[in-house]
Amino acid sequence: MAGVPGVGKTTVLQELEAVAREKKVSLKIVNFGDVMNQLFKKHGKNIHRDHMRRQDINLQTRVQQQAAQKIHSISSKSTLVVDTHMFVKTVDGIWPGTPKRVLEALDPDLIVLIEAGPEEVAKRRTADTTRERERNTLEDAKADLEWSRYMASVNAVLAGVPIQIVQNREGYHRQAAEDLLRIIESLS
């Protein structure tokens, strides 16, 4: 499951956990960035998660692959939901969040994009003071949403899986979580 910063992915996933509990659906959510951050620490890099993308691209690539393998090794009788991004803006340019070798390690059954309108994304980014972001313009939000769809399309082709898009409109995160759970349940 992926979404650009500002779509409300974290909020939707928190709500997804609550809805799944209510409906007695067993699922486990793993944040790809959290796993990467733990691995960076093992490499002696105790950095803020917003600074991971500023690290040497070779180190990022190694850690990204290690994170995918670690996530794949999680044995769970629950449905595994991987919280990630389709792309990352690094110092070297736009980098795929799930390049081919990472995608192969994760072996997804489905790709879900959480989206919101570009105006909402830009507004949420500006309001979120907990994150370190370079720019928060409407044009940036539009471009990021487009890049996310481009990358998701490539991933779907490579993995041979469908894409679903869930809208997270302002004030409707519960509806987005319910939509997401319906999609997850349809895979069973």
What is the meaning of each model-derived region?
Residues 149-188:
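NTP-dependent small-molecule kinase module
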Residues 18-28:
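Post-Walker A helix-loop "phosphate-sensing" segment adjacent to the P-loop in P-loop NTPases
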Residues 4:
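P-loop (Walker A) phosphate-binding loop of NTP-binding proteins
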Residues 1:
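Hydrophobic anchor at the beta1->P-loop junction of P-loop NTPases
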Residues 84-128:
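ATP-dependent NMP and nucleoside kinases share a basic, alpha-helical "lid"
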Residues 28-96:
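ATP-dependent small-molecule kinase phosphotransfer cores
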Residues 10:
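Walker A/P-loop
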Residues 7:
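ATP-binding Walker
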